[in-house]
Structure formats: structure tokens, C-alpha cells
Amino acid sequence: MTSVILAAAAAATFSFGEVKVHCEDRDGWKLAFAREVAPDGAEIAKITLDCAETKIPPKTWLSAKVPQVGMDYSWNVNTGDCGMRPNWGARSHTEVAQGMPVFVFFDGNDTSHFSVAAEECVRHLNHVGGIREEGSALEIGIGWFETPEAPISHYETRVRFDARAKGFADAVREAVAWIEKTAGIVPCRVPDAACDPLYSSWYNFHQDVFAADLEAELAIAAKLGMKTFIVDDGWQTDDTNRGYAFCGDWQVSKRRFPDMAAHVKRVQDLGIKYMMWYSVPFIGLKSANYEKFKGKYVNGNDRGMGAAVLDPRFPEVRKFLVDTYVKALKDWNIDGFKLDFIDAFRFAGEDPAVKENYAGRDIKSLPVAVDRLMTEVKDALTAIKPDILVEFRQSYVGPAIRKYGNMLRVGDCPGNLRRNRFAIANLRLASGSAAVHSDMLEWNFAESPEHAALYVINSMFGVVQYSVMLRNAPKEHLAMVEKWIKFSQDHRDTLLNGKFTPRHPELQYPVIEAESDKEVIIGLYDDGRIVDVPAKKTFVMNASGKDSFVIRRGGKISEVSCKSGDWIEL
């Protein structure tokens, strides 16, 4: 172990070069920095800050430069593409409800040559991971306490570096597993129902939802094999102007749902579990509760969406939210929740609590309060229904989120089948046993059913969520959906629990494989590729856009005929 202790700055030599840490405005803070080696051979930077008094911690920055050798691409869980960026254009941030502090740098042969992971997955971190033009070096930076932070007297954290060449997918999984172990994260239970095909009201209905319409739609969904339903925004308001001005009272619109409990029961009688959407932080400016919580907001009008953002550092705010969900669960006997917009718990400038000396707040750190809130929600709901389903949406998909959510969904990407595929694969690598869901699928019914099937195939390595208006769908489209739902359930264990290998992230995974003891399933999403097929029973889902593809099996190359939008057993 190498250790350097200084008042304001520290440095240590790692296998890839020097790592430096420094503090600004230390004001009595002492910095300790040590290099350690993990049992698996990765290198760990341990950073400790101590102060004799309770004070706002100093801005702290870790930096390193690594020769750009073999590192042609970069990855993190919320990336839109994997292109390397210059250091001045490679900035991002993570916290409890934003992203994941894991970064992998790799080549075009699915080999990682350098990865970085930070233990801190609750508080705000700033990141840099880009190329410094002078010298063609990868510049790494991590910043702590650069946004408003509560006073503390001690802080300890670790950063993991892995400069060994290894498979890209293994590098991601190992980094995430290290965070979970080091940060003491215990993921919540994932019921089997979290992996059932799902129907969402959002893209097809938006806010214009009515009980009778939904029940008619879900009767069709049930026949096709869907098992879960999410009623999204609209059930709580008569307004259809988008925005969130009427959120926060959480009273059912009687015009839309005259008897919510009876409606839920009718849907459940179809064999479908019922989940409800809530925008967790929002209190609409036109809601009755807006005046009640004045003075207890961190943001007066989030992004101009007509809603203020609650401050969960107030215990009465957390109690209000927990009680709201518990009441819904008890009153309507629902099966789960889509808890939305928790990334909106953020400051629009300075922390308003500082001027008030944190009056009324039992927690001073906002990210820590968000973590406490979601833990209290999970504990309250599972005490009533242990198999409760809880969905969170990208980009709040970090390690801490898995403590309270068992369904992690791709962020909104309507009509973007490639983005759905890419994000599903990223989440699968980074989310352990959580059920990874596609963004809701929709397509134009003027498409051929074979072309519409491409949307489904691109999402098959996650739990597929559908949001097309089934009652208006041509019968050929319904038959296509039913066919693929059956395939997904016949091969569910392989698709969702098998060894998962997505290839070439720099190309957004043109080939994805899943393998179980009994079979291999391959998704082909690009033409002109030779697909390596093992001797084991193999299914290829063809979304290449071509009606044939080339395989290599047992050293022999041959062409296989299979319609695009279909699958074949080999």
C-alpha cells in the first residue's frame, strides 16, 4: 500500500501512472490518500477527509492521465454513443438518481483496456473522461462536493481502476459488482412478475385515459399474452395539456375512473397485474397541496413544467409521499408503482436550506434524503405486499436505485429501435438481477407486420413493454405481437437469465447473444456479418433487414434463408 498524507494535496503512483487528489478551500480539513490493491488485482484509490469541526466539505478533485493505448471508445450506462471525446467535451455527473459512476475504455474487439468506478453512488459526482490533445492521453477526473453539500466532519470513499485487458462486458459487470460490495448495497427482491410482458398506456393514450377504454384494450392485451399494465399520467386529472400542474393531490379523476378499486379488480380478473404512475417530486402549481408545502421545495418550477419540487429533507414531506403510496396500495389493491422523475430532486442554484440553517430538516444532504425517502417507500410497500413491483426509468438506474426498484426501464425513445436495443444491453450489463425493460414500443400500422417486428426483436433481450393501440391494430400486427410474446416466454430463461454477451458497443451492439444450458439465442441487427453459431441448439432472431444471412458453424460457412422480422432454429 502506498500512502501520502498532506493538508491540501496528495499523490500516489499506480500501474498506469500518477493519480493526484487535491482539495480547495480546505479550511481545517485534512486529506489522506492511499493506493490499495483489491483481491481481484484492480487498483483502489482510497480518499479520506477529516475535520475537527462539522463543516461544508471542500471541493475535492482526483485526476490522472493514462496513455491512450488500445482505448478507441468510451462507455457509460447512459451514453448515446461510444465515441471518444476531448477532455473539454467529456464531462458528466452522477448521483443517486442520475447515471452510474462506471466508465470503460475499450477497443473495436470488445476488449477493455481501462475502467474507472467510484464507490460514491448517492452524492453528486462530476466526471471527466476524455482525450487530452497534448500527448494523446486519456484524462480522468472525478470531483466531489462541487454542488451544494451539507456539513460533515468525516468522509471516506474509494475509486477503482482496472488497467488490465479483459472482455468489455466483464469489465462493466466487475466494476458494478465492486460498487455494490464496497458501498454495501443490497438489491431488492425481483419477483417473477417483474419479467412479464407489459402494456403501458403512455404513448398511445397519453393523459386521455378512461377506465372503460383501458379495460377494452387490456382484454386484447391479455389474449396476446401480456401480464402487467401501467396506467401512466392522466388518471389523477381531467386536464390533458401535458405538464404537471395538477400533480400532487393524487386524487382519482372520477370522470375517468368512477370506481378505481373496481376498475383495478376487473383488470386483475383478466390475469393482468396493475401498476400506477406517480411523479414523485412534483407538486403542481395548480394543485390543492401546493400551498400546504410552501417553503418545503428545492425548486419552485422545475424546467417550466408547472410543478414545484418537494424537499425530502423535511420528514413531513417524506411521510406525505410514503403515506400517498401506501394509501393507494391499500385502497385499490394495486400490484406496483411507476415512480417517475426522481432525478428532479435537485437544486436550481443555491441550496435554500443554508440561509435557513436547515430549519425543519432532519437530513442536511439532498441526495442522502432522496436515498432515505426511496428506502422508506420500499420498506413501507414491501411490508404490505412483499412482491410489490417498482419501476424506475433511465437515467436513474445507478447501483443505489436497485435497493428500491426491481424494474429498470430504458429512457423515452419512441420509434427509435436502435436506441432501445443499445440501452437495454447497457442496462443488462450494469443492473445485475433487476428486470430490464424496453421503452414502450409503438409503430405505425401502415408498416408491414414483418417490419413492425423489428421493433420487437430489437427489444427482446429485455422485458418488452408495448404501447400501441391494440383495438386499432390490423389483425396481422396482433398476430405478430402474439407470436413474439410466445417466443419470449418459451425462451424466457435464456433471454433474460442466460449468459448475456452483447458485441461491439461502438456499433450499438449489432449482434447480441444469450446462452443457457439448453440453447443459444442470437439477435442479428445488421447485415453483412458472419454469425458464429455454436453446435448447441441455436435460434437466430433476424432484424438485419435482409432475408438471409451468413453463419459459421464448425468451421464451415454457409448462407441461411430467414425473413427479416422472423426467427429460425439452427
Predicted regions and their residues:
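Short, acidic/polar
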Residues: D208-K223, V317-K330, A452
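Sec-dependent N-terminal signal peptides
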Residues: M1-A10
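Active-site-proximal substrate-binding groove within the catalytic cores of carbohydrate-active enzymes
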Residues: F145-E156, L373-L570
